[in-house]
Amino acid sequence: MSKLRFTTDHEWLRQDDDGLLTVGITAYAQDALGDVVFVQLPELGEHAAGSEVAVLESVKAASNILMPLDGEVVAINDALPDAPELVNQDPLGEAWFFRFRPADAGAWEKLLDQAAYDRLLNANADA
């Protein structure tokens, strides 16, 4: 599997061979949301880090997906709006949300690696 990085908002990012980053939510996030019933994907084009780019609705709550880094969204997962249950079934695979070209290729290194993300999850469990 390709190398993954994570955000404190429980999004995962995969660096693909073409230099693009693919984004989805972690198993922890989908578990916290419960059964996902609606997905609204981002518009193609430039988005600033931290901006709301997608929306998930579940039986428990609605949640915004934030743009993890400055960049240009170049592809969306057209399957998700018609099959939102994929988010629960395969959050780290088929349920990716979008692919984007980061404005700063070096920003990847500032994201959480697996060990740092695991520490975040453990801290949340202890809180």
UniProtKB/Swiss-Prot annotation:
Record key words, sorted: Lipoyl
UniProt xrefs under CDD domains: GCS_H
A Pfam family assignment: GCV_H
Modified residues (N6-lipoyllysine): K60
Cofactor dependency: (R)-lipoate
PROSITE patterns in the cross-refs: BIOTINYL_LIPOYL
GO CC term, one of those recorded: glycine cleavage complex
Disulfide bond positions: none
UniProt GO BP: glycine decarboxylation via glycine cleavage system
InterPro entries named among the record's database cross-references: Biotin_lipoyl (IPR000089), GCV_H (IPR002930), GCV_H/Fam206 (IPR033753), GCV_H_sub (IPR017453), Single_hybrid_motif (IPR011053)
Keyword Repeat: no
Domain of life: Bacteria
Note accompanying the cofactor annotation: Binds 1 lipoyl cofactor covalently.
Domain Lipoyl-binding: 20-101
Family: Belongs to the GcvH family.
Subunit structure: The glycine cleavage system is composed of four proteins: P, T, L and H.
Its job: The glycine cleavage system catalyzes the degradation of glycine. The H protein shuttles the methylamine group of glycine from the P protein to the T protein.
Record-given protein name: Glycine cleavage system H protein 1
Native species: Pseudomonas aeruginosa (strain ATCC 15692 / DSM 22644 / CIP 104116 / JCM 14847 / LMG 12228 / 1C / PRS 101 / PAO1)
Organism classification: Bacteria, Pseudomonadati, Pseudomonadota, Gammaproteobacteria, Pseudomonadales
Gene: gcvH1
